[in-house]
Amino acid sequence: MGTIKQIKAREILDSRGNPTVEADVILDSGVMGRAAVPSGASTGTREAVELRDGDAGRYLGKGVRKAVENVNTVIADALCGMDASGQRALDDRMRELDGTDNKGKLGANALLAVSLAAARATAAERGQSLFRYLNPEGPWSLPVPMMNILNGGEHADNSVDIQEFMVMPTGFDRFSEALRCGTEIFHALKKVLQDRGLNTGVGDEGGFAPDLPSNEAALEVILEAIDRAGYKAGENVWLALDAASSEFYQDGVYRLASEGREFSAEAFADYLADLCARYPILSIEDGMDESDWVGWKALTDKLGDRVQLVGDDLFVTNTRILKRGIDEGVGNSILIKFNQIGTLSETLDAIAMAHEAGFTSVVSHRSGETEDTTIADLAVATTATQIKTGSLSRSDRVAKYNQLLRIEEELGEQADYPGLAAFPQLRRG
């Protein structure tokens, strides 16, 4: 038993230069666990509350001193003396202290920092890697990476509507080889863009953000990059999209500003289905607005047997909302962002519910990240089989890939890489 002796938090900066919460959980043995909390750019309205100070004279109102103070006083007073390995008891106690449905009193950023730091402290106390602590007996699986190599929407200052254009290297036996593939495609894409006289600056998540005339133009330059790198789109590399449709949905209409087009839900489902018919797209995230359940159902009925349809803003890592999706046949996958729900226990519950229902799960970063690599261990421990942690630049993104390389090395022959088997519910022919 590792008894919690001290909990302390501080304000640090994330990858976008905004404050976030970092917490240390120190055990009576002197062992410490440390965790930092990410922050999103495009956020679902039902996400747990990220407590900000609102003081316009400091960090443009985005300071987190209130959340830090809540950790150092209310949470520390309640949790010191508890067993750090009792993850659910710790998380339940913090939820009781908060007393709201959305963690708006103490802040999900306060709760999550402590929740993750406690897990790290216990793993360190036991001399285990975090993924082994979370799942001591296995099985473990290295995830297929969704590599966001071209950014649009809220993640970039350009004219592309779709937020993320990703590559998924599936035709490989090891994660390290899949990572090499994605890296080579990333560098090839830079050359493709340079040859066309396009900008090669990067967005929040490390992907390129060129000013392209349409969403299809983005797909075309990626296909050219895959070919130049020596890989085969639709064979050993597939494409994935994060439409982030809530960002361009208003009054029942989906508006693609870059193309000057407007769609009803049914018509936008047809638009996405047409893209999937003409391009090797295996996964679409947030293809409909978070509140458009009718549209989501139409999209699922149209594509759900052959394309992974991931709910991010739709499900917000919340088991209550996920259960509705499962019951109504909406989507077939959930994006997992632990700051959407605010504790490790609730995150694990969402993954378990998804897998029990035959849904896939994709463990994800946020656009505002830190050097914290917890999501890499979480993906391996839960056999999520997929991870989304940005492009192949910016150390806040690459840190997660590097942690997965270390885990692969530690697992040795047990380091399973699923490839296309990560998508068991999809019909391919």
From Swiss-Prot:
Signal listed as a keyword: no
Q: Describe cofactor binding as the record notes it.
A: Binds a second Mg(2+) ion via substrate during catalysis.
Query: What GO CC annotations are associated with the protein?
Result: cell surface; extracellular region; phosphopyruvate hydratase complex
Give the EC number.
4.2.1.11
Which keywords appear in this protein's UniProt record, sorted alphabetically?
Cytoplasm, Glycolysis, Lyase, Magnesium, Metal-binding, Secreted
- Which reaction does this chain catalyze? (2R)-2-phosphoglycerate = phosphoenolpyruvate + H2O
Which residues does the entry assign to the active site, renumbered to this chain?
E205 (proton donor), K337 (proton acceptor)
- Pathway(s) of this molecule: Carbohydrate degradation; glycolysis; pyruvate from D-glyceraldehyde 3-phosphate: step 4/5
Q: Which InterPro entries match?
A: Enolase, Enolase-like_C_sf, Enolase-like_N, Enolase_C, Enolase_CS, Enolase_N
Tell me the compartments it is located in.
Answer: Cytoplasm; Secreted; Cell surface
User: Which positions in this protein are listed as binding (2R)-2-phosphoglycerate?
Assistant: Q163, K337, R366, S367, K388
What biological-process GO terms show up in the record? glycolytic process
**Does the record bear Amino-acid biosynthesis in its keywords?**
no
Please tell me which top-level EC class this enzyme sits in: lyase
Record's SMART domains?
Enolase_C, Enolase_N
Under Gene Ontology molecular function, one entry of this record is:
phosphopyruvate hydratase activity
- Per the UniProt entry, the disulfide pairs are none
Residues recorded as binding Mg(2+), renumbered to this chain, are D242, E285, D312
Q: Which cofactor does it need?
A: Mg(2+)
Pfam families of this UniProt entry? Enolase_C, Enolase_N
The task this protein performs is described as:
Catalyzes the reversible conversion of 2-phosphoglycerate (2-PG) into phosphoenolpyruvate (PEP). It is essential for the degradation of carbohydrates via glycolysis.
Describe the protein's quaternary organization and the partners it interacts with: Component of the RNA degradosome, a multiprotein complex involved in RNA processing and mRNA degradation.
What family is this protein classified in? Belongs to the enolase family.
Protein name as catalogued? Enolase
Q: Which gene encodes it?
A: eno
